[in-house]
């Protein structure tokens, strides 16, 4: 119940989750699934590299999906956890998924908190966003990659994703004076006027794309200007570290 608090810095976290090996595998997985993932990407309007990156960060490309019985996990948390109302609802959602024939009780496995399959959907997310891309009558986020990619793409699209932009960029703070205006949204041109520069210390593109500034703890003279798609990633997982990791991994995937 009580887990020790051990806070990684962003750099420590990124070194663990965006490794050279994971970057290599991500590019390989993109090539292996390219035809299918491009179709899904076009249909939903979510760039393929983000679908591969999410898959990689969430479950190491479907390798680490959790071996817990989702029903047992949710039942335990519903009656023993701090957020019992939430987990009770998720338990009933999970039972509905079984009742609808998408997966058997025995095969419904996931994390200790009830997140399921290769995209780690909670049962409520499954009911809202899961997709039967191969049209076989079941939304199989456990074993069918096309359903996994389409479900992730559908989720991002429905929470506001746009394939016209990316996630954000690392920036040099330069002469920027940190003020107490949290979550201030400005255009790149306005951020440039505030003294923020590209990593090579050249001027930002003077365009009207809106961004907000994130400065992680102990991050020296650097930060991230993040765009609207970053908030879609936060909707998926409310961690700046997670969203930055997905963004960084996606940047290293060559779409061709």
Q: Regions from the language model: what does each represent?
A:
Residues 24-32, 41-48, 64-68, 81-89, ...:
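Soluble non-cytosolic domains of exported or imported proteins
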């Amino acid at each position: 119940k009580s887990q020790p608090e051990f806070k990684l810095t962003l750099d420590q976290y990124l070194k663990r989750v965006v490794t050279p090996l994971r970057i290599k595998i991500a590019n390989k997985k993109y090539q292996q699934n390219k035809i299918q993932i491009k179709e899904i990407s076009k249909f939903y309007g979510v760039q393929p590299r983000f679908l591969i990156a999410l898959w990689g960060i969430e479950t190491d490309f479907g390798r680490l999906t959790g071996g817990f019985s989702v029903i047992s996990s949710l039942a335990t948390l519903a009656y023993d956890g701090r957020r019992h109302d939430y987990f009770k609802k998720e338990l009933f959602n999970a039972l509905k998924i079984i009742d609808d024939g998408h997966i058997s009780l025995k095969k419904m496995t996931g994390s200790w908190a009830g997140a399921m399959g290769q995209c780690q959907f909670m049962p409520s997310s499954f009911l809202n966003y899961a997709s039967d891309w191969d049209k076989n009558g079941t939304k199989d986020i456990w074993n069918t990659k096309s359903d996994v990619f389409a479900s992730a793409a559908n989720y991002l699209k429905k929470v506001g994703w746009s394939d016209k932009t990316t996630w954000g960029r690392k920036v040099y703070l330069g002469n920027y004076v940190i003020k107490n205006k949290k979550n201030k949204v400005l255009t790149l041109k306005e951020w440039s006027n505030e003294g923020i520069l590209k990593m090579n210390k050249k001027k930002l593109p003077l365009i009207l794309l809106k961004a907000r500034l994130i400065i992680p703890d102990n991050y020296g003279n650097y930060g991230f200007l993040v765009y609207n798609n970053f908030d879609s990633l936060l909707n998926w997982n409310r961690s700046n570290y997670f969203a930055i990791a997905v963004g960084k991994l996606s940047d290293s995937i060559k779409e061709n």
